Amino acid sequence: MSNIVIVGAQWGDEGKGKIADTLAEKADLVVRYQGGNNAGHTLVVNGKKTFLHLIPSGVLHQHTKCVIGHGVVLDPVALDEEITRLQAKGIAISAENLFVSESCTIITSYHKLLDAVRESNTSEKIGTTGKGIGPAYEDKVSRKGIKFKHLFDKDLLRSRLAISLAEKETLFRDLYKVEYPTLEQEFDKLFALGQKLKQYAADTFSIIDQAIAAGKNVVYEGAQGVLLDVDYGTYPFVTSSNTSVAGVYSGATTAGHGLDHVIGITKAYTTRVGEGPFPTELFDDVGKFIQHKGGEIGVTTGRIRRCGWLDLPLLKYSAKCSNLTSIALTKVDVLSDMDTLKVCIGYKYEGKEIYCAYPGIDLYKVEPILVEMEPFSIDETVTKDNMPAALKTYLKTIENHVGIPISSLAYGPSREQILFFEDYFKKG
C-alpha cells in the first residue's frame, strides 16, 4: 500500500496529469482534492491527447477508480460536458469508476458571472480563469454554499439558491448593472443536472478510508501549484484553495492517514499564466523559444504562458510548504539543444542574498542570481546510461539547492517518456 500525493511545485501547468496518469497504472484510487475546472491536465497516449479538467487522470485505466473529493468546487455543467466528451471518445465512465463527493460545493451561473464582472471592473487584474472558483469558495466559507447533494432535493435546492442569490442580486443589479438568471431559471437547470449526475454521488470519505484500511494504493492528484496556494502563494495573485499538501487533508481524507510520498511536479524551467510577480521571466527570444517549443498555452484558458528560467529559491520554498519528499522534473526535452541555459540559485533582496523564498518577500523587488549551466542534448529515449553529463549536472544542481532528490524525469509528452529513479509504490 502507498499513499502518494502529486503536488504542483510552481504556478501550475507543471505536468501533474502526465505523472498522475502514469502512476494510475498501479493505483486503485486517483483522487482530486481541491480546485475545480480551472485545472487543465493533458494526457498523451499513443499520440492522442486527452484533456481533463475535473475528472482525475486515472480515468484512462479501467481498473482505477476516480474520486472527486469534497474539497473540489464542482461545476455540474462542466462535469456533465466532460463526461459526455470523454465517453464520445470511447473512454468508459460510469458509477462504477467515478465517485463524486456529495459534499462538493457547487459552482452556479451566479458564481461565474460574479467572477467575470469583478475581473473586468477592477484595476488590479488577478488573471482569474472566470470559472467561478473564487466566488464558490466564498459561499462555502460564508456558509451560503450549495452542496452536490442539495441538487437532488427540490425544496432544499430552491432554499439554498435563494440564500446564495440574496446578496449577489444586489451586486448584479445595482453595482455591476448586468443581467443575471432568475432563481427559477437557475433552479431548473441545476435540478435537471442533479438528476443526470446523481448516479455519481458517493460518500467519498468512506471510500478513501476503506481503501486505505484495505491496503490499496491511493494517488491524490493536486490542481494548480503551491505558489498559487491561497495561504502560501504570491497573494493576491493566487487561487482560492489550498494547493499545497494541506489540501489533501481538508479536501479528501484525514490527517490520521500517513502519506508515503509527496511528489513535487516541477518543469525544468518556470511558467506562469496570468498576472503576478515572476523573478526569472524572460522577455527575449529565449523566452519565446521556450514558449513555442514547450507548447506553453493554457489548456483551460487558452492564454499564452509566461516563461522563464528555473527558480530554485521558489522551488525550495514549495518543498518546505508541502514537505515534499522528492521532485518529478518534467519537460526536460524543451531545454535540449539550447545555446544558453541558466538557473536561478538565489536572490539579491534588501541588501543581502537569500536562497529560499518566504511568505513576506516582495518578489517584484528581488534580483535573481543566475548561473550559467552547460547546455545539453538528449535523445528521444533517455536512460541512466545515455544521460548527458551536462544534464546530470543540471539535475544535481537542483537537488543540492532544494535539498530533496529528483525521483523521476519526464522528457517528452508520451507515457513512455518518463525515467523513474524510484518506485513510488515500493515500501522502504
Swiss-Prot record:
UniProt-annotated binding residues for GTP: 12-18, 40-42, 305, 331-333, 410-412
GO CC annotations on file: cytoplasm
Binding site for Mg(2+): D13, G40
Residues binding substrate, per UniProt: V299, T300, T301, G302, R303, I304, R305
Enzyme class, first EC level, given as a word: ligase
Localization of this protein: Cytoplasm
Keyword Cell inner membrane: no
Pathway entry: Purine metabolism; AMP biosynthesis via de novo pathway; AMP from IMP: step 1/2
Superkingdom of the organism of origin: Bacteria
Amino acids binding IMP: D13, E14, G15, K16, N38, A39, G40, H41, T129, R143, Q224, T239, R303
GO molecular-function terms, A-Z: adenylosuccinate synthase activity; GTP binding; magnesium ion binding
Required cofactor names: Mg(2+)
Catalyses which reaction(s): IMP + L-aspartate + GTP = N(6)-(1,2-dicarboxyethyl)-AMP + GDP + phosphate + 2 H(+)
One annotated GO biological process: IMP metabolic process
Protein keywords: Cytoplasm, GTP-binding, Ligase, Magnesium, Metal-binding, Nucleotide-binding, Purine biosynthesis
The protein's role, per its UniProt record: Plays an important role in the de novo pathway of purine nucleotide biosynthesis. Catalyzes the first committed step in the biosynthesis of AMP from IMP.
Subunit (UniProt): Homodimer.
Cross-referenced HAMAP family: Adenylosucc_synth
Record's protein name: Adenylosuccinate synthetase
Organism, as annotated: Francisella tularensis subsp. holarctica (strain LVS)
Phylogenetic classification of the source organism: Bacteria, Pseudomonadati, Pseudomonadota, Gammaproteobacteria, Thiotrichales
